[in-house]
Each structure stands twice: as structure tokens, then as C-alpha cells.
Amino acid sequence: FKDNLGFGGGVEHFESWLNIYKKNYFQEWHNHNFALISAIYYLKTDKDSAKTWFKTPIPENPNKPIFNENNPYTWEKYSIDQEEGTLILFRSDLNHCVEAHPTDSVRITLAYNFKKN
């Protein structure tokens, strides 16, 4: 993943944590600018669980509106279908959030950050 993004050299894991979302729990928009690569591993989730959303790094521009909201090249934000056992890797400076968890079942993820070594 790091090679595809053009990051030379090695990376090392330097922090991780467990997220447990009960009904109505959420995580506001944020990023991990201090890291290079972040990861989310879905331990317990289902189709009705809260989604993780990612915001485009391209600044909004009124001169270039979204012509088709179903076009993945112009989305302002995007969520990936999540299943138990899914691992998502992304640039740490990408803004992301978790919407309010709508169900009584618990949603559990592991999150990781990696830096250059």
C-alpha cells in the first residue's frame, strides 16, 4: 500500500486501539496527520451498523460542482461496505468519521497508525 502511494522506505506500527460503538455512539470528523498510514479492522459489524465515512481531500470548488452524485470520481464523501474481517488502509491525513450507530448490537473495530521508520 505504501509503495502504491509513493512512500519510500519502511513503516512501523506505533499505536492501536479498540473502538466499541453502542447505540448512538459516533466519532466526529478527524484525521491522523501525525501518522503516515492508518488502518481499520472490522471485528464485529453488520449491514445495519454505523458506517465509516471518508471525505475527499479535494477542496470544494463552486466552479466545479458535482454533476452526478453517483459518480465515484466526484463524491464529496464515501463509505466502504464493511464486513467482519475487512481491513481498510488509508492515508492518515484523509478526514474520516463514524456516523451514529443505529442499532442495539455492538460494532467493534481495531484501529492502527503507522509511521515511517
Can you say where each PLM-predicted feature lies in the sequence?
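A short hydrophobic beta-strand segment most commonly corresponding to one strand
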Residues: 38-40, 104-117
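Catalytic core of non-heme Fe(II) oxygenases with the double-stranded beta-helix
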Residues: 18-89, 106
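Short, well-structured hydrophobic secondary-structure segments
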Residues: 1-4
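Asparagine-centered strand-capping/turn motif at beta-strand->loop junctions
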Residues: 100-101
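Short, loop-centered acidic/histidine patches that primarily coordinate divalent metals
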Residues: 57, 91-93, 113-115
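Short coil/turn motifs at secondary-structure junctions
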Residues: 44-46, 97, 115-117
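Histidine-centered metal-chelating micro-motifs
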Residues: 26, 93-97
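A short coil-to-beta-strand element that immediately follows conserved catalytic motifs
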Residues: 6-16
